[in-house]
């Protein structure tokens, strides 16, 4: 069993296609494909790339795995623009990309596609792993090796997992947390609950990389839950116009 864990396509169709091609060339086949949010964005080089990425995710080609998708920062901004969240008018998006960026995102995804994105998961709990865009604290939570250890401990406790895979930072990293003594207490309406010892075993947070954020270079993660083996992949690719890509495909580019 081997998982491919992606994040941050950000509308970069060429990058996603490059990763899919790389997956086909692996010696050990992938059994599950996870995409941890930010499937849309403003990194596409062609008009309509966000729509094309969503179509590609929804309808894989014959022989390809159906991706399991969760919601990321860019999707949440899209929901805000379309009145599908508790925060209207996407103030986070406006602060990040300005009015032109807001307009570009609004025009790049159809209402039906936004509804499909809204139906996707917040995260995935598999075995002793949590796969999520940010963390249980929220979609915008950006964990990195520089995040304070006590904060990483908090996120792992909230995740109730030994391995937390996240994509918000866009970086590839592996960060082990080994608390020597850590207790947690939950307070409910009935008062404080019994203290729990959280220091029994080492846990880790894994940054899974970014497929589309860095032009020409896609990064993603492979993980085998049976052997606990983890590896990071880097794929270099050339960004091309749609017309050229179609001609290459007609010649057998990427065929099995």
Language-model regions, residue ranges each:
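Short amphipathic alpha-helical segments
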Residues: 17-18, 47-48, 82-83, 143-144, ...
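Beta-strand-turn-beta hairpins that frame and shape the catalytic cleft
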Residues: 1-4, 124-130, 199-205
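His/acidic metal-ligating clusters that form di-metal
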Residues: 26-29, 106-182
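Acidic, His/Gly-rich catalytic cores of divalent-metal-dependent hydrolytic chemistry
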Residues: 175-256
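Core catalytic region of metal-dependent phosphoesterases/phosphodiesterases
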Residues: 2-6, 11-107
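Short amphipathic alpha-helical segments and helix-helix/interface helices
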Residues: 20, 51-61, 114, 150-156, ...
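Active-site neighborhood of phospho(di)ester-bond hydrolases with catalytic His/Asp-centered motifs
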Residues: 6-7, 33-38, 68-73, 132, ...
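Active-site environment of divalent metal-dependent phosphoester hydrolases
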Residues: 10-15, 41-44, 74-79, 137-139, ...
């Amino acid at each position: 069993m081997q998982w491919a864990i992606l994040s941050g396509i950000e509308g970069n169709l060429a990058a996603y296609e490059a990763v899919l091609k790389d997956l086909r060339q692996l010696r050990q086949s992938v059994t599950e494909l996870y995409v941890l949010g930010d499937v849309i964005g403003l990194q596409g080089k062609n008009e309509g790339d966000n729509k094309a990425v969503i179509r590609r995710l929804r309808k894989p080609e014959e022989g390809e795995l159906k991706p399991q998708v969760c919601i990321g920062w860019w999707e949440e901004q899209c929901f805000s623009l379309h009145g599908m969240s508790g925060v209207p008018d996407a103030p986070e998006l406006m602060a990040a990309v300005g009015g032109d960026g807001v307009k570009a995102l609004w025009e790049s995804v159809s209402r039906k596609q936004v509804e499909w994105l809204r139906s996707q998961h917040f995260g995935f709990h598999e075995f002793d792993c949590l796969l999520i865009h940010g963390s249980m604290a929220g979609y915008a939570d950006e964990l990195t090796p520089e995040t304070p250890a006590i904060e990483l401990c908090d996120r792992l406790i909230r995740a109730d997992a030994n391995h937390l895979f996240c994509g918000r930072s866009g970086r590839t990293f592996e960060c082990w947390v080994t608390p020597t003594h850590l207790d947690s207490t939950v307070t409910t309406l009935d008062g404080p609950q019994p203290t729990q010892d959280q220091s029994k075993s080492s846990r880790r947070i894994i940054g899974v990389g970014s497929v589309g954020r860095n032009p020409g270079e896609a990064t993603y993660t492979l993980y085998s839950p049976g052997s606990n083996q983890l590896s990071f992949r880097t794929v270099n690719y050339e960004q091309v116009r749609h017309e050229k890509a179609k001609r290459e495909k007609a010649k057998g580019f990427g065929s099995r």
